């Protein structure tokens, strides 16, 4: 598939997601980085978003809870280029009923080439990157070209 570019502006649209056993870790991480996150537009799956907003005072756009379709909503926003990066504290030790949704979410994040952090260390690296506060060009699939090919 051909690619084109997309600009991630200095004010990022960031998805915050955590499995149940990791919500406290994500809350602690978010509290620690509250000032750095403030200028950005934050999204989260339902329960996580409500906890983060209540405990940090940050404005969070809460979607549905992950198992109720929130992971798929988030994937749709990624495909629509409405999410620039994702912080997803996931639990690799416990199976969840919505594991197929999580796999689909990670697949879409990979297809659309957005930066993804899957634990505290990678989230710290992402947030402290010199690119975090800048406009950044990323390669993304050329959907228009893909569609033209398919319809030819």
Curated annotation (Swiss-Prot):
PROSITE patterns (UniProt xref):
METHYLGLYOXAL_SYNTH, MGS
| One biological process term in Gene Ontology | methylglyoxal biosynthetic process
Annotated residues for binding of substrate: 19, 23, 45-48, 65-66, 98
Active site residues per record? 71 (proton donor/acceptor)
EC number, UniProt record: 4.2.3.3
Classification via InterPro entries: Methylgl_synth, Methylglyoxal_synth_AS, MGS-like_dom, MGS-like_dom_sf
Q: Which GO terms describe its molecular function?
A: methylglyoxal synthase activity
Reactions listed under catalytic activity: dihydroxyacetone phosphate = methylglyoxal + phosphate
SMART domains in alphabetical order: MGS
Gene3D superfamilies named among the record's database cross-references: Methylglyoxal synthase-like domain
Q: List each coiled-coil range.
A: none
Annotated ranges, domain MGS-like: 6-152
- A Pfam entry, by short name: MGS
Q: Which UniProt keywords apply?
A: Lyase
Its Gene Ontology cellular component terms are: cytosol
- Role description: Catalyzes the formation of methylglyoxal from dihydroxyacetone phosphate.
- Family under the similarity heading: Belongs to the methylglyoxal synthase family.
> Which PANTHER family would you find in this protein's record?
METHYLGLYOXAL SYNTHASE
This protein's name: Methylglyoxal synthase
What taxonomic ancestry is recorded? Answer: Bacteria, Pseudomonadati, Pseudomonadota, Gammaproteobacteria, Pasteurellales
Q: Encoded by which gene?
A: mgsA
